[in-house]
């Protein structure tokens, strides 16, 4: 039996789509030295090659892919998006604006200089910034621009071509820049990170190990009674001195949870909760009494929960003001915009931040109710909210504003982005509304992006050979300029205008470029995870600004002559 693969793929759009995705994802696993190609470029390369053989896909699949992707970008940005505008994130907002704005202006200038059309120019901007949101925003705006069919088809093909030719240039140049730019400035990144650590009482170890608290029990002996000197637990400040707290006391056979007025007496049996190293450092006065192995005394339910910051008495407060340890709870992690932050007593909490807290189940529940809510332990997505806000986003995208002879519409990209932000923001404020497990959100976002990349590659593949011959050299030069010059401008602005700490500044610059591989290099150079503070500060807002940049470049292009 003979199987004509070409006819089989051309006759089945779904099969073709998943063949492209499978081959592209395999290609994306390849590494060039320390650089991995990545899923996006793998799928794009495979789709361009198959596009040269005149394979094509239904445009509805392409549109659905980009819609899912941009909506999920908004959902991820939502919890922290508004805090960037309304509080101490103004420096991060300004850095993101400088990075995206300078790249947009430079791309427009180079596009006019080389005589390109809007498709090549917008594609070059998206590729050089390694930003699929730019590509998505520009593509959607082009489709709603009113161009005649043939001109629109050429612009969309050139959009994909420009992106494909400059993506690797943008990625490699930024990674090289992240490795060497810190060495070209006068301040050592490791020293800058240590300075922040000293000022804020941070652990600078990027690979800090997290342990669960353990419980051990001791019988109070004469040494411990002498050590307490008749003071109650509040006056002693047990946690400050030992790193452990007394969870239970058995006295005369009666088991009780002590309050701050309790005074230890000879023969008491006490249950201490703390990290393993805190137990190891206990004063000998504790260990001189006999260790007790009592099931009832040691029977505590130690849990670890993810607590979402929501309530007004926690939002805007510093981490130290929560006094978690005074309530018998231990903080393991602080996560903002899916980025793990250093545990810093001076970190100001934003609505939607996630604190991973360990301790007795009752105490953790109490602290969670005080600062927000415990994240739902469910793998069930609120599909009703997801679909409803998706519809709202599409309807917002249909709105058109008319000014004399000029009309302006938000388009699907901006509408879905806004609706996604609102869903993410509302989820951060209402624990039972709009829940989407992070794994599900990441899967939908990644799948939507891959479908979109497959579609644009197949549609642009037929013209890539001509494009490479005519504009390959120009694209290389333009890609390097748009990738690196905004980074230098952003550095100068942050270092000499905003006067930011260099470790935070370089982290924020990589966040403004939404480039995780470059961020890892900055953290390695600083030998600290402190740059993650800056990365998280700009990441959410940069994703939104990059999408808008794709829309803006298409809108302003006709007016430049």
From Swiss-Prot:
Coiled-coil blocks: none
Superkingdom of origin organism: Bacteria
Membrane-traversing stretches: 8-28, 32-52, 66-86, 94-114, 158-178, 383-403, 406-426, 451-471, 475-495, 540-560
GO biological process: potassium ion transport
Key words, A-Z: Cell membrane, Membrane, Repeat, Transmembrane, Transmembrane helix, Transport
Record's bilayer topology term: Multi-pass membrane protein
Listed InterPro entries: AAE_transporter, RCK_C, RCK_C_sf, Transp_YbjL_put, YidE_YbjL
Keyword check for Transmembrane helix: yes
Compartments reported by the entry: Cell membrane
Gene Ontology, cellular component aspect: plasma membrane
Record family assignment: Belongs to the AAE transporter (TC 2.A.81) family. YbjL subfamily.
The name this protein goes by in its record: Putative transport protein YbjL
Gene name as annotated: ybjL
